[in-house]
Amino acid sequence: MGADAIQTNGHDQAKLTGGEEIQRLRCFVKNYEWGKLGPESLVARLQEANTGQRVDSEIPYAEFWMGTHESGPSHVEFGSGHGVSDKCMVTLKSWVLDNPNLLGSKVVDKWGCDLPFLFKVLSVTKALSIQAHPNKALAEKLHREDPLLYRDNNHKPEIALAVTPFQALCGFVTLKELKEVITNVPEITELVGSKAADQIFNVHEHDEDERIKSVVRLIFTQLMSASNNETKQVVSRMKNRLLLETKHRELSEKEKLVLELEKQYTGDIGVISAFFFNYVKLNPGEALYLDANEPHAYISGDCVECMAASDNVVRAGLTPKHRDVQTLCSMLTYKLGYPEILKGFPLTPYVTRYLPPFDEFEVDHCDLPRGKSTVFPAVPGPSVYLVIEGKGQLRTGSSKVLVNRGDVLFVPADIEIHVTGESDVMKLYRAGVSSRFFQTL
């Protein structure tokens, strides 16, 4: 839903309504080509429920944004009428700028009059680019040098919480696995040269981390810097080799994935570089957190994602978009090993919290059976609630809001929320500022 779909009638009514305890948000959708098509997409179904816009079966619906970022701003809806003319809509960012008390003083002192997190739902049917997000210092540098490509100066740590079975590439495999990759995938040596490739066999587990990382950095940078023509030829030969080998043996999961990526991005360097990364499969309810400067690529599935409020992405493979190979290869940490999978911890019988090691955000997941209730205690910062399935009600001390799938609600600081399920199961997610941040003040 672009900005041209919103009627903005000024801030006066928003200022008058700034004291409301719960406000509905109208949210923004991104139609990237890797998104699921039409009604197959969870994002499409949420958009239809949230905005009333009909789903087009020919269009990919990739991301559902909830927040204040200028690349996809949410709007606050005021007015009780049923027609567009009866309502006033302003951006969530304008509203919190006019009413900083909604954020709480601790949040304003730390991040100013803005939401420090960005909340999303992703529906993925085709692999996203091999990418990483910059830390704060690099984000400031990139934004200063190329503000059209890097739209803000913020870092972007994030968490991805699986709603359906979810697959991703994330982080570099172990040193032992990298040695097996160089041995078993001769096409890598073709692209980087034997002098570089053989260096992986001259480092060992007991060597200093920096020595190991420097070798991995060298090989990976050489690989990602290969010429397009050479890459296309080598990736094609690798595909043909793997297809031939299927007649004699069962391919590994990674090899099968690489063949699938080759169908999606024929001749792309990201196809062969996938061998360097951990192949992660998340079950619903499991989560993956991604720090700055860690390589990753989502492969398929639906997830809820939360991050620091940024849209900065450095890409280098599996994409038709701009690639910044030099920046990506120089920024990565080259930390080796399988990433930590978060399963969350229970707050109540119905609520699970996911608490990554970042100040800006945490995510709660609530599965509430019919007739059951739970309480989200008041916190010193703002929250955004998303109903992803079912229906129920949210209550404060003075108001009640009936909610259904696709409803997104902004709750100001210091408001306790009581939730009751009114369907077989109501599934909702809450994003808020990390409770660790408030505990350390």
Curated annotation (Swiss-Prot):
InterPro entries per UniProt: Man6P_Isoase-1, Mannose-6-P_Isomerase, Pmannose_isomerase-type1_CS, PMI_typeI_C, PMI_typeI_cat, PMI_typeI_hel, RmlC-like_jellyroll, RmlC_Cupin_sf
Species, as recorded: Arabidopsis thaliana (Mouse-ear cress)
Induction pattern: By sugar starvation, by dark and by 3-O-methyl-Glc (3-OMG). Down-regulated by sugars. Up-regulated by DCMU, an exogenous photosynthesis inhibitor.
Temperature optimum or stability note: Optimum temperature is 48 degrees Celsius.
Keyword entries, A-Z: Isomerase, Metal-binding, Zinc
Reaction catalyzed: D-mannose 6-phosphate = D-fructose 6-phosphate
The encoding gene: PMI2
Phylogenetic classification of the source organism: Eukaryota, Viridiplantae, Streptophyta, Embryophyta, Tracheophyta
CDD domains: cupin_PMI_type_I_N (cd07011)
Protein residues bound to Zn(2+): Q131, H133, E158, H296
Tagged with keyword Zinc: yes
GO terms of biological process kind: GDP-mannose biosynthetic process; L-ascorbic acid biosynthetic process; response to absence of light; response to cadmium ion; response to DDT; response to L-ascorbic acid; response to sucrose; response to zinc ion
Annotated function: Involved in the synthesis of the GDP-mannose and dolichol-phosphate-mannose required for a number of critical mannosyl transfer reactions.
Family: Belongs to the mannose-6-phosphate isomerase type 1 family.
Positions of the catalytic residues: R315
Record text on cofactor binding: Binds 1 zinc ion per subunit.
Cofactor(s) needed for function: Zn(2+)
Activity regulation, short description: Inhibited by EDTA, Zn(2+), Cd(2+), DTT, p-chloromercuribenzoate and L-ascorbic acid (AsA).
PROSITE patterns membership: PMI_I_1, PMI_I_2
Protein name per the record: Mannose-6-phosphate isomerase 2
GO molecular function, one term: mannose-6-phosphate isomerase activity
Tissue specificity comment: Not expressed in any organs under light (at protein level).
Pathway: Nucleotide-sugar biosynthesis; GDP-alpha-D-mannose biosynthesis; alpha-D-mannose 1-phosphate from D-fructose 6-phosphate: step 1/2
pH sensitivity of activity: Optimum pH is 7.5.
